[in-house]
Amino acid sequence: MSIQICNFPFHPKFALQPRAQRSTRIFARTENDSPQSKTSDQQLNLSVLRFTFGIPGFDESYLPRWIGYGFGSLLLLNHFSASAPISESQMRSEALGLSLAAFSIALPYIGKFLKGSVVEQRSLPEEGEQVFVISSNIGDSLKEDLAWATYVLLRNTSTIAVLISVQGELCVRGYWNCPDQMSKAQLHDWFKKKVDEIGLADVKETLYFPQYAGSALSLDILPDGTRSLFVQPLVQNTNEPQKVNGFLLVASTAGYAYSDKDRAWIGAMAEKFRG
């Protein structure tokens, strides 16, 4: 499936409506689970999860740099603390070790340079509601899969908002620009109405907006400050061409938030929900 990288404004079917300023309210909403029998296939296949230490504020992409600092410091300490004369072979070994340490330190910067742009860090929106809504008309196994998928997308990427639609049923998680005086059922229906108005259910090609910003944009369910948007359609694995089963949408407050590796990984997550 091809990916369209869009650097032009995206105009959905409904216009941007002015909204009043309000402070951030953080809460979670979820539909009541209907009692259904659980199957043995309830757990999400975690093979798509990426490695992380889980340390708040620690960027694992800079791990080679810290390793280089550590080994380089040990080599220098060993060199200056040696009491015996240093042989020529030891000097060559230390020079090679310092060269490898320097390369390890520079590796994260080289990686960003080769990508062609610097990926910014996400920031939480100043406005918006943090919500968690799952349709009640789906089975417990699919609910668990959707809950895990949205969690790992928020945890392992720069995403601040994720929406998954599977056969018309929704799972919405993260920060969204939604009303704050609605019940759980009303909030779910509100998101479903907005999705129908936007027309994302009819998208058949992967869309990526690395510079989703500006007043001309009108996707008003996203929080203010959204700068990147990625939409992955869920095309059914049938002989019928281009039969869409739903879509996966992620948004970030960082520009160029989703690299080729990120988009491939999100696509692997979407594979879990294809028909």
Curated annotation (Swiss-Prot):
- What are the boundaries of the transit peptide? 1-19
The topology of this chain with respect to the membrane is:
Multi-pass membrane protein
Q: Chief location of this protein? A: plastid
Membrane spanning segments where? 66-86, 94-114
An example Gene Ontology CC term for this record: chloroplast thylakoid membrane
State the phenotype upon gene disruption: High chlorophyll fluorescence phenotype due to an impaired photosynthetic electron flow. Seedling lethal when grown on soil. On agar plates supplied with sucrose, seedlings grow very slowly with a chlorotic phenotype. Deficiency in the accumulation of the subunits of the cytochrome b6f complex and lack of covalent heme binding to cytochrome b6.
What does the record list as coiled-coil region(s)? none
Q: Which Pfam families match?
A: CCB2_CCB4 (PF11152)
Read off the InterPro entries from this record: CCB2, CCB2/CCB4
Arranged from A to Z, the UniProt key words for this protein are: Chloroplast, Membrane, Plastid, Thylakoid, Transit peptide, Transmembrane, Transmembrane helix
Please verify whether the record's keywords include Cytoplasm: no
Intervals, Stromal compartment: 20-65, 115-275
Q: Where in the cell is it found?
A: Plastid, Chloroplast thylakoid membrane
Residues exposed to the Lumenal side: 87-93
The Gene Ontology biological process terms listed for this entry are: cytochrome b6f complex assembly
Give the superkingdom in one word.
Eukaryota
Quote the function comment for this protein: Required for the biogenesis and accumulation of native cytochrome b6 in the thylakoid membrane. Controls the conversion of apocytochrome b6 to holocytochrome b6. Required for covalent binding of the c-type heme to cytochrome b6.
Q: What protein name does the entry list?
A: Protein COFACTOR ASSEMBLY OF COMPLEX C SUBUNIT B CCB2, chloroplastic
**Which species does this protein come from?**
Arabidopsis thaliana
